[in-house]
A protein has these predicted regions:
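Core dinuclear metal-dependent hydrolase active-site scaffold
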Residues: 1-14, 77-134
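Active-site metal-binding motif and surrounding structural segment of the metallo-beta-lactamase
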Residues: 1-50, 139-141
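Structural motif
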Residues: 18, 118-121, 141, 172
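Active-site flanking residues adjacent to catalytic metal/cofactor-binding acidic residues
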Residues: 22, 123, 144
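Active-site environment of divalent metal-dependent phosphoester hydrolases
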Residues: 25-29, 57, 107-108, 127-130, ...
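Active-site neighborhood of divalent metal-dependent phosphoester bond hydrolases
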Residues: 42-46, 54-80
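Cap/insert and terminal regions of metallo-dependent hydrolase folds
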Residues: 127-173
């Protein structure tokens, strides 16, 4: 699991089947160029899944990655297919993976969390709507944002995260 795209090189990742963007903030996507090495190695464009709001912003900001520019070919395949509560399937070398996008509040903007089987990932979140909390039952593992001990306008505090954990009762968090 890569927390943001700038971590790809440092994590020594040899292969990715797809990228899921939670939202358009720089800490999530300002490393998208680092996918170029993987794309060249595997000789196929990288599918990048996102919601419409993210696609509008990231598509403009990194148009050269999605559309190509001059002598540089496009390296990414923009997939605007993430909708809250609608499962998408990603086929990869390890087999198909079903991913459920989850709605969450990141303060000034919405962001997405993801549930994959009995695993859920909810970063960059300050509030989880009731609908999302209901979709988080029965988890083995829950990765959740907790920026600091005190309140923050765009990130959960430790006490908020512990409250969600107490409510949904994952085996690990």
């Amino acid at each position: 699991l890569v927390g943001n795209l700038r971590d790809v090189d440092g994590a020594r990742i040899d292969r990715l089947d797809a990228v899921l963007l939670t939202h358009e903030h720089a800490d999530q996507c300002h490393g998208i160029d680092d996918l170029r090495a993987l794309v060249i190695r595997h000789r196929q464009r990288m599918p990048v899944h996102m919601d419409q709001v993210t696609a509008d912003i990231v598509g403009r900001r990194f148009d050269y990655c999605f559309e190509g520019a001059g002598a540089y070919p496009a390296i990414l395949d923009k997939k605007v297919d993430l909708e809250i509560g609608q499962v998408i399937r990603i086929d990869g070398v390890g087999g198909p993976v079903n991913i459920l996008p989850l709605g969450q509040d990141h303060g000034s903007i919405p962001s997405l969390g993801f549930r994959i089987g009995t695993f859920a990932y909810c970063n960059d979140v300050v509030r989880l709507p009731e609908e999302t909390l209901e979709r988080l039952g029965g988890l083995d593992s829950f990765v959740v944002d907790a920026l600091r001990y005190t309140a923050h306008p765009t990130h959960a505090s430790v006490s908020q995260a512990l409250g969600w954990i107490d409510r949904i009762k994952p085996r690990r968090s």
